[in-house]
Amino acid sequence: MAQIDFRKKINWHRRYRSPQGVKTEHEILRIFESDRGRIINSPAIRRLQQKTQVFPLERNAAVRTRLTHSMEVQQVGRYIAKEILSRLKELKLLEAYGLDELTGPFESIVEMSCLMHDIGNPPFGHFGEAAINDWFRQRLYPEDAESQPLTDDRCSVAALRLRDGEEPLNALRRKIRQDLCHFEGNAQGIRLVHTLMRMNLTWAQVGGILKYTRPAWWRGETPETHHYLMKKPGYYLSEEAYIARLRKELNLALYSRFPLTWIMEAADDISYCVADLEDAVEKRIFTVEQLYHHLHEAWGQHEKGSLFSLVVENAWEKSRSNSLSRSTEDQFFMYLRVNTLNKLVPYAAQRFIDNLPAIFAGTFNHALLEDASECSDLLKLYKNVAVKHVFSHPDVEQLELQGYRVISGLLEIYRPLLNLSLSDFTELVEKERVKRFPIETRLFHKLSTRHRLAYVEAVSKLPSDSPEFPLWEYYYRCRLLQDYISGMTDLYAWDEYRRLMAVEQ
């Protein structure tokens, strides 16, 4: 296994800047401070304040949005990073691992990866993802990609339908159809950072948000050695060349992950498990007393001194015995969060250090907090109680169904843009107004300039005389629509759907 040297991983160069010479410790830190500024001031981060964490279209400011959740993940990520660096310092391994002058960048990459980890999520979270994927599957039928005879292919898009005697083109058609039917928030985050917003972040900072390493066009089983890392799509066909360059710059083998991404993932796991339960109490789905009962019942028999006793029971007892006139709810969750972090953060840090050779190589095929330990059991406890008593609550399910309908409806409303022929859509893009297409013209005007420019740039780079051109053009047209709708906030998507469906406000 390769020697651990983080100077080979924390690459401070950028895609759109000429390579620079040796930098001092302070100069490198300034480069990552620039990354922080670009990220924190980006509109993608601001939009998180009106995107769902658990409860869509929530007006209660005490209930978490994607932004407040991401800020909490950022703090936990910083805590884990500092714990790792502190332990490596005690072991006198900072210099040996090339981290003695990179502790600041190490922390900053983790923090900003945490803050950005949800920027690609569509309105209404996972139900928004499902709506996009279901809508495209019902038109592209990726499962028919291996149909025999080819006349059995049910794809409704002529350019992407399989044809006899066109095997090289059919291979591309299969990839495109599979890719478009696997929209995923993490993959969209990569697309946002690189293609749509051109943030030109350092290679190391982008590596921190490449959570999954499976291409969206992947078909079939994933390698056993990487089945966890390839659990979900991590990037699209449109970013394939960029990810190939990223792997080269970060010395990553195929389907391997950047080391600091494991820290971001652990911070997210720790943060949302407690937060979802607290939000459920805030929403009056259950009381603190009922929550404690649910947790106690789900954990089962335990002894004094067990992790459940030290974390959950301790929080419950302290919140009940507090002599100050304070909210029992607030006190319980404060102690529960503190107790949880005090146990899970050191454990995650030690797991990172214990498995550092595989993590540095990018091949550690697990999450830091998914093993046979009590710490892992505690996270599972929080998740299981949330699934059973929060996500299955009628109010939550109704909002999710409404969100699914909104996203499906918006895609259907904008469908005329996908129905235009290549020549007609090209004319609309060039002229921005075509008299014989009044509906399509007005729909096109509603698309954001950023997304339209990304489409134009991608298509302009394609050789127009190539037989692949119609396939790629349609692919980027679909991406244009997915980019626009997935970039909406929950409230904007809701209002836009009602406006375009002529529903009374």
UniProtKB/Swiss-Prot annotation:
Gene Ontology MF, one: dGTPase activity
Q: Which reaction does it catalyse?
A: dGTP + H2O = 2'-deoxyguanosine + triphosphate + H(+)
Record-linked InterPro entries: dGTP_triP_hydro_central_sf, dGTPase, dGTPase-like, dNTPase_1, HD/PDEase_dom, HD_domain
Cofactor requirement: Mg(2+)
Which EC class heads this enzyme's classification? hydrolase
Task: Tell me yes or no: is Magnesium among this UniProt entry's keywords.
Answer: yes
Q: Which GO terms describe its biological process?
A: dGTP catabolic process
Query: To which protein family does this belong?
Result: Belongs to the dGTPase family. Type 1 subfamily.
Q: What is this protein called?
A: Deoxyguanosinetriphosphate triphosphohydrolase
The source organism is Escherichia coli O127:H6 (strain E2348/69 / EPEC)
